[in-house]
Each structure stands twice: as C-alpha cells, then as structure tokens.
C-alpha cells in the first residue's frame, strides 16, 4: 500500500464503494492508514485523475483527501484542515443520498475524527503565528460535525440495523471533546438529551458508552451534581478496558474528587496503582479534618490540579474538612450543647488565619444550611445545639 500508484489506489476506492465495503473505504480515507505516507499519492492537482475513475461526489471527496495528504506532508495544517472540511462535505452529499442504509458509517467515523484532529493542529499553528484565537478552527469543525449529527439523528425511516442513528454517539463524543477543549460545556446539553432519549442508548458499543459517560460525568461534576457525576464516572471506570491504564487514570482524576465530596476516600493502594499520589495528602487532610494539611497539599500540587481543571472542585473539600473537624470536637466533648469557643480553639489549632467567633458562627451556619450538621446556633448562650440522632449525617446523604 505504501508504494501503489494513484490509479491502483483509486481502483481500490472504487471497488470498496461498489461493494459497499464501508470499513475498507474508511481505511482508504483515514490518516491512520499507511497510504498517507505514499509519496506517489501526494499530488498537487489530483482532480482529473479522480474524475476519470470515481463518480461524483466521491471524485471530489477523494481529490480533497489527496490534497489533504499533500498539505499534511508539508506540515501545513491550516490547508490540511481546509481540504478535510471538503472531504466531509462531499461525503455528506452521498451519505444523505444513501436512503435506508448505513454501510458508510465507518467512513464518517474516520473522516470526522481526522477533521477534529486537523482543526486542533490548525488552531495551534494559527495561534503560534499570531493569526487566530485558540479554538477558532475547532468551533468551525464542530459546526460541520453537527451537520453530520443532524443527518444521523433525522434518519427515522430505516430499519433498526440499517439506521444512521448508529452514528449519533460517535459524533456526540467527538463534539464533547471539542466543547470541553474550547470551554463551551453548555453546548453539550442538547446532545446529552438526544442520546438519553434515543432507543439506541444501550445498544452502542461499550467503548462509545464509556466515552459518553466520562464526559457527561465530568460535566455533572462542574454543574455540582455530584451524585450523577459519581454514577457516570464510576460506570466509565468500571467498564473501561482493563488494559487501558492511561484511560482509567484519566477517569480517576475526576472520579476521586467527586467520591471525596461524597465521603468516600481512596486507598493509598489505588493512588499508587494509578500514579495519583498527588491526592494522598488531600485524602489524609480531609479524613482528619486537618485544614492546615489540606491547604498545604492543594498548594503543593496546585499546578497539577489546575491543569486537570479540578482545583476549584478540590477547594470545596474545605467545607468537608470543617465538618470532619467539628465532628471530632463533638465526639471529644460528648455533649449535644457545644460551646462555640471549642470550635474556635480547634480552628486556631489548625492555624486557620485570623479566625474569630463571628467566623466560627458563619462556618457552622453554612454547615447547617448545607445539611452537614443537624442542629442550630443558640446566639444567647453562644452554643451549637446538635440533634441527638445522627447530628453529622453521612456525606453521601447530603451532597
């Protein structure tokens, strides 16, 4: 394949189209396939050759693909993205014309994946040259992916196995990757709704479902819907292929903070296994209600947590640390009427800076409001009066 002529290549394409062999055709238009390294296919003007062998719109599609190969070989990713856009647009013409059949879905997967990758590379190239903003090309790519999504979603006439709706989840996952990259998470909402209401929801491949759950779980975490985040991220982690250590680690980066906010602390064994020891001191601090250690741990690994986009989520663990510290005070004093001074002493012991009795009242009022403490503040007696039954409810019942 690395040394075939342009005519041999186009003949293979024509045979794949004639036999409706979507997988073979997808290979012949994929940048993961070795043909893209073949210098004999890097033509400046391949249109005439393509028109001699292929029918429209495939002639236009594969001419654009060959121009894209040429641009990519010259590391001109802006030009490559332009031609990859043409590839997808030409493909859509034929895809829409294929009524009640979906053999071309593998082609769509291949070319839309490459479109997103080229858009990302083009973005970086333009930003480096000072000619564009981060995400400009990805945003345009998302619009083209949405055109593909609409074609798939509107296929209501085909039989279940022949439906183009099988392509919806792949496209949604590609769009999620773009929206997370350009920080436009609100655009995920209608896509999530479309998949949740689809009767294909449980039929998609496990790999696609894992990716979907991972992104929806992350979005739920940013929306502070921690129970949904735990459910979706746990599904992704449990069903991710056991050999995919890297992917499992990536899921854990978001699952761990969610679990901790719900009161489930990770074991050191788990953190060591997935090389996530950055969480070890955070876990210890929250479990002990040690605010001093928590602040130090967050500061020490700040760069890692910010890069992963979880620093602000981990900051929410401070309120859990207050809850755990104040629970220790309650267990120590063994009374349901607790002097506010006792909490002030505990906070000063933890070196919480410039804390006074007013701030203690404010922290406790917040904990009561959030459901972390069952009780009330008696301002007259300067005491916290807690419930005799379960005054510090389990975190999983609160968040």
From Swiss-Prot:
InterPro entries: Csn12-like (IPR045114), PCI_dom (IPR000717), WH-like_DNA-bd_sf (IPR036388). Pfam families: PCI. SMART domains: PAM (SM00753). PROSITE patterns: PCI. GO terms for biological process: poly(A)+ mRNA export from nucleus; post-transcriptional tethering of RNA polymerase II gene DNA at nuclear periphery; transcription elongation by RNA polymerase II. GO terms for molecular function: double-stranded DNA binding; RNA binding. Belongs to the CSN12 family. This is PCI domain-containing protein 2. The lineage of its organism: Eukaryota, Metazoa, Chordata, Craniata, Vertebrata.
